[in-house]
Amino acid sequence: MKVRPSVKPICEKCKVIKRKGKVMVICDNPKHKQRQG
């Protein structure tokens, strides 16, 4: 999980979602997981 000021999809499987008011990227590749913070 990477915590970044700006989250962007890295590949075509990355999905940008909102959980509990936080913007997150979920993906099949665990290296692509990101959270805005």
From Swiss-Prot:
PROSITE patterns: RIBOSOMAL_L36
Domain of life, per lineage: Bacteria
Coiled-coil blocks: none
GO molecular function terms listed in the Swiss-Prot or TrEMBL record: structural constituent of ribosome
Alphabetical list of InterPro entries matching this protein: Ribosomal_bL36 (IPR000473), Ribosomal_bL36_sp (IPR035977)
GO cellular component: cytoplasm; ribonucleoprotein complex; ribosome
SUPFAM superfamilies the UniProt entry points to: Ribosomal protein L36
GO biological process: translation
Keywords assigned by UniProt, alphabetized: Ribonucleoprotein, Ribosomal protein
Family as reported in the entry's similarity comment: Belongs to the bacterial ribosomal protein bL36 family.
Listed name of the protein: Large ribosomal subunit protein bL36
Organism: Staphylococcus epidermidis (strain ATCC 35984 / DSM 28319 / BCRC 17069 / CCUG 31568 / BM 3577 / RP62A)
